[in-house]
């Protein structure tokens, strides 16, 4: 079984293979330095935000960066129905992305409105987008937004 680990603060990522009592290091690098927004694995690729290069696609097997994009800021990501839902922790911007190793492919975006008035001026939206039964849920402190994303 493969075990992938990632952390922020300059630590980076690591892929291990576990076979019974034997653990083998596959790679360790600083391509994916994900603080707390999570990553999504689809096929042989990982998608998420890495401190420094921004939103990235990483080859799961080799650890190499496939592409990066700094169009919008650090945040969390979720996946449903063939799309990535990425949310900026600072601005409340939500972006719909096509997961592709061919490059950053944006299919729409919006700004979360209204946003919480109790969040401090430097406060962040650290909750992950949640998708269930055709609905996208986004929480900002005391507010929960629900969007119908069913096809």
Located regions from the model:
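Noncatalytic, solvent-exposed loop/strand surfaces
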Residues: 1-151
